[in-house]
């Protein structure tokens, strides 16, 4: 099965974080949303989710894209909604 390979960029630091795999963009976004809902994340609007490539777990082949693809950059109101759900 092919999995997407993702990373979150910190726009203030101008660097990508650790990579992780997810079965699709929706699952990767859910994981990203969980991170942003954490009230300990001080500047959630500094982060964007990118897809870097694909990993085929049956062949072990990792294929990177020529350029990272932006998957999700939440708006301020979306971040607020995530954080409100976390507090409840």
Residue ranges and their predicted role:
Residues 10, 30, 82-84:
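Short, intrinsically disordered low-complexity segments
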Residues 15-24:
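A short, exposed loop/beta-hairpin motif centered on an aromatic-Gly-Thr core
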Residues 7-8, 21, 48-50:
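Conserved short hydrophobic patches within well-ordered secondary structure
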Residues 1-16:
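Short aromatic-glycine-(Arg/Gly/Cys) micro-motifs in beta-strand/loop hairpins
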Residues 23-44:
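A short, charged, amphipathic alpha-helix used as a generic interaction element across diverse proteins
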Residues 11, 25, 52-55:
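Generic structural motif
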């Amino acid at each position: 099965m092919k999995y997407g390979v993702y990373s979150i960029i910190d726009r203030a630091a101008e660097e990508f974080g650790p990579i992780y795999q997810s079965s699709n963009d929706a699952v990767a976004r859910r994981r990203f949303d969980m991170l942003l809902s954490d009230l300990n994340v001080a500047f959630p609007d500094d982060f964007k989710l990118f897809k870097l490539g694909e990993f085929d777990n049956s062949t072990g082949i990792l294929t990177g894209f020529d350029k990272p693809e932006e998957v999700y950059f939440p708006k301020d109101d979306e971040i607020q909604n995530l954080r409100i759900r976390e507090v409840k």
